[in-house]
Structures are given as structure tokens and as C-alpha cells.
Amino acid sequence: MFMDFKTLQVTDEGPILRVQLNRPETGNSVDGQMLSELLAVLRALEDDSTVRVMVLSGAGDHFCQGGDRAEFPALLERDPSGSELRSLAEKAQRVCSTLSQLRLVTIARLHGDVIGAGLGLAVFCDLRVGADTSRFRMPEVGLGVPPAWGGVLPRLAEEAGQAWVRRLLLTAEAFDAARAEQLSILHEVVPAGDLDAAVARWAKPIIRRDPTTVRITKSMLNARAGATQLAVASHFDDELLTAAVARRALHRR
């Protein structure tokens, strides 16, 4: 079903599909190729009724340490108009939108650093379990760019609450797994060695549920959470991101 990928490790276990971010040498930083490969997997899942649960994880020491920062200035240098960077931002939004709207249940298995784009990918999953040693951060404002990746801001505010998200974004402070659970960014915190067992406790009953009921329930939850507004909110994200990175590139000259 799935081709060989350069940035993902995909394991088909019948009703469960495991998708592992596989750039451990970069902390699984998200680049354009990873986005393209994620989008290919997600679109294939839209047409596959046999998979009931997708588990998203990261190889190595971290789930994901954010977007590939080296890619942004490289794209601007190659295309000063910013069109390639806008295309990258639009691709990130498509990945997150498709992830949130899949008919099957998605589970994020989190460990190590869950930063920036990594946190964005995680919050678009239905269920999230994290190791008690995992660390979270939204560093964008501290880096001089808006929190534009993937249209994450509305989703994060809906999941964790507007007041806390305001604090975490403006201060760019790191927070631990206990705080992430308090904010409902994590549904459960377990020792790192128990992550697979925790995922299995969720996945096993889910794959026995009626798939139509699961699909309708997810649609109802997404509508309640304002998921239909993500496209509207993220309409501005690529423009903001391009402008911010362009300003940073100009200031460095």
C-alpha cells in the first residue's frame, strides 16, 4: 500500500497503521519532503477502509523538535518572492487539516521533545499519550515568527484554552508532561517504557467499534471544536510566515 519513504517509517499491522517520523539525526524536524510523504499517507488512508487506527510517533530521542529551520532561509534565497515558502506553509496546513478530518482514529505517541511543528502535528491527532519525561514548547515568537505552522493556533486554543495558549506562545516557555496533561494537550502521561502499552489500551477497543459510528462521532466532535474554521484561520498563516521570515532574512544582511 505504501511506498518506501525517506522521512517516514510506515508499518502496516492490519487495522493499525504505525507512522513514525524518521529523521532522528535532525530531531525529526519537519521539512517539505516529510510533509509531502505525510500527505501521501493520509490521502491513502482516506480511501482505505481496513485501517481503523493510525499511530503517529517519532524515531530516536524525540518525537519532533519542530520545523526544519534551515529550509526556510534556503527557500527564500532560492525564491525571494516567497512563493515557495507560501507553498510549504500551505502544505503544512493541508497535512494538519487532513489529519484532523480522517475517518479513522489517530493516536499521537509522544516522547522527548515535542516542539513547534511537532506539537502542531500532535494536537491534530484525536488522542495523545506522552512519556512523563517529554517536554513541550511553542518557540515561534521567541524566534521572531508568528505561530503560523499548519493552522495550529485555533486547534491549540480549542484544546488547551485561550488564556494558557496566550501565555505559552508569548513567553515561548517550555512545559512538562504534567502541565501538558493539565492543559489537555496530553490525555494520559505514562513512564516512557509504558507508551506502547498505553497506545494498545486505546487501540484495541477502538478497532472493534463500528467504523460508521466512529466516523460520524469524529465529524460531530470536529464540528463542535470549530474544525471547519481552521481553513479560514490558516488562510492568513502562510502570508504571516512569509513576511516574518523575510524580515528576519533582511535584518541579517
Predicted regions and their residues:
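A short, small-residue-rich loop immediately preceding and capping a beta-strand
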Residues: 104-113
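Short acidic-hydrophobic, aromatic-tinged amphipathic segments that line or gate anion-handling sites
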Residues: 129-130, 188-195
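Conserved CoA-thioester-binding segment of acyl-CoA-metabolizing enzymes
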Residues: 1-59
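Glycine- (often His-adjacent) and acidic-residue-rich active-site loop
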Residues: 58-95, 142-144, 228
